[in-house]
């Protein structure tokens, strides 16, 4: 399956469910308490992150999709912290604030990236929460996917009303289920239980075949569009009536913390489906996203640049010959990772040792090296009849095979000013013995605060000399 990055900016999603605040106390631990055999943590940092349904909405917004959230909180500082964090992330949130009801807070005491203790602050909701009929109908307008983020905390008690309201508008409903009764999700487009939650409903599955059989039966019993079972280190299994099971292996290189991994799965699914992706593609993207987020500490979101880079790595397109649109996206991702972009250009007709040394020196000026190559017509204008010896496709293929080179692109003009104006590299590098002001494009790069560097050429290394030697012999 070929993966590509969806247009998340045109994919509005509404999340309804249990919101909570994930609070972290970070500090050092160097002694045992004299009062009891427990470590003493000297707290030096307090960190708040949106959790539960709020983390789902945050993940959707981090991918660049418009995200709205409906939830229940208390009237306290934890609710204020949640609202401020979500507003800063661009999430439109509507909270039903209940007096004398604490906002759900999960407090984790951390030392040296290890969780020592978790303390939960929560009480059952005394009222009938989320009786927000008018608000839900209003927020459903223009929405392409509805997510029910159910943590079993009591905020969601009207699942069927929400599912039917969305279905009446033709809006897919995705649910992250909890509890021992999945019938409350009847008619949903997709539910995403983990293996433990799934087996709570259908019983233990001794093998994959039994999982598939029981999953297909559950689909029919509950009139579900699809079922995605997340299986930890065994990946994910997507089941649909009348379709073969789709098994995807886990993508995590190293599992550091699984907190919020389920939120990442359903948020990526929702954003991808809202962007028009088919379900198998959306599941593959969610699987890739989950593999990234479990390598982070605590409740965390995956950004669009992180997902795009993972897709490029998966498709083998993280490096190599790119078109302008692909190159600009790759540059955006690199800058999101604080990488310095270096640019150089030339004909590179017959690649020789001098070129290789020069390109290695150029790459050393930053983190990513772009090599812009004159196309065949411009080389002929610059070098005269009989040149180039090698076509532009072959020249770019050879350059792309060098370890020092990240991206290769061609340009039709004699000089690269037009390309420089669009790429805006941090460093422009040229080989030769002339001054910086003589470098073509130096004025453009210096104009936006970039750097221009001139590197010396390797002696007795020249494509022209090689061509003349071949002709004489």
Curated annotation (Swiss-Prot):
Keywords: ATP-binding, Carbohydrate metabolism, Kinase, Multifunctional enzyme, Nucleotide-binding, Nucleotidyltransferase, Transferase. GO terms for cellular component: cytosol. SUPFAM superfamilies: Nucleotidylyl transferase, Ribokinase-like. The active site is at residue 263. It is an enzyme of class 2 (transferase). Catalyzes the ADP transfer from ATP to D-glycero-beta-D-manno-heptose 1-phosphate, yielding ADP-D-glycero-beta-D-manno-heptose. In the N-terminal section; belongs to the carbohydrate kinase PfkB family. In the C-terminal section; belongs to the cytidylyltransferase family. This is Bifunctional protein HldE. It comes from Pseudomonas putida (strain ATCC 47054 / DSM 6125 / CFBP 8728 / NCIMB 11950 / KT2440).
């Amino acid at each position: 399956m070929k993966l590509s990055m969806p247009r998340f900016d045109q994919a509005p999603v509404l999340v309804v469910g249990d919101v909570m605040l994930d609070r972290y106390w970070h500090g050092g631990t160097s002694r045992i308490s004299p009062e009891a055999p427990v470590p003493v943590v000297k707290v030096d940092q307090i960190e708040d992150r949106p959790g539960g349904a709020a983390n789902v909405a945050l993940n959707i917004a981090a991918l660049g999709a418009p995200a709205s959230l409906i939830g229940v909180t208390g009237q306290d500082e934890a609710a204020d912290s949640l609202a401020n964090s979500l507003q800063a992330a661009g999430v439109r949130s509507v909270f039903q604030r209940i007096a004398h009801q604490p906002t759900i807070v999960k407090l984790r005491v951390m030392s040296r990236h290890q969780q020592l203790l978790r303390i939960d602050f929560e009480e059952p909701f005394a009222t009938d929460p989320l009786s927000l009929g008018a608000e839900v109908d209003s927020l459903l307008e223009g929405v392409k996917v509805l997510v029910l983020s159910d943590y079993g905390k009591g905020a969601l008690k009207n699942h069927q009303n929400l599912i039917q309201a969305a279905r009446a508008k033709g809006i897919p409903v995705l649910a992250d289920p909890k509890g021992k009764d999945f019938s409350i999700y009847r008619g949903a487009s997709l539910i995403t239980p983990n293996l433990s939650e799934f087996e709570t409903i259908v019983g233990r599955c001794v093998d994959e075949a039994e999982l598939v059989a029981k999953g297909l039966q559950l689909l029919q019993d509950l009139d579900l569009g699809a079922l995605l079972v997340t299986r930890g280190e065994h990946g994910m299994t997507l089941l649909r009536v009348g379709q073969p099971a789709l098994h995807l292996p886990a993508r995590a290189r190293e599992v550091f913390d699984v907190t919020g991994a389920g939120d990442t799965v359903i948020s990526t699914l929702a954003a991808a489906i809202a962007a028009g992706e088919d379900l198998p593609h959306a599941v593959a993207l969610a699987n890739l996203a989950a593999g990234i987020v479990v390598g982070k500490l605590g409740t965390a979101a995956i950004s669009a640049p992180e997902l795009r880079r993972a897709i490029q790595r998966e498709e083998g397109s993280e490096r190599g010959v790119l078109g302008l649109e692909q190159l600009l996206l790759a540059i955006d991702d690199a800058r999101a990772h604080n990488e310095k972009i270096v640019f150089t250009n030339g004909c590179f007709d017959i690649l020789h040792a001098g070129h290789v040394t020069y390109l290695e020196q150029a790459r050393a000026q930053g983190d990513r090296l772009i090599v812009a190559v004159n196309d065949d017509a411009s080389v002929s204008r610059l070098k005269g009849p009989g040149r180039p010896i090698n076509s532009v496709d072959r020249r770019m293929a050879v350059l792309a095979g060098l370890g020092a080179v990240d991206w290769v692109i061609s340009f039709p003009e004699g000089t690269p000013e037009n390309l420089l104006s669009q790429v805006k590299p941090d460093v422009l590098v040229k080989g030769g013995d002339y001054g910086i002001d003589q470098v073509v494009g130096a004025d453009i790069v210096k104009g936006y605060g970039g750097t221009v560097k001139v590197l010396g050429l390797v002696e007795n290394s020249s494509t022209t000399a090689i061509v003349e030697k071949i002709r004489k012999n």
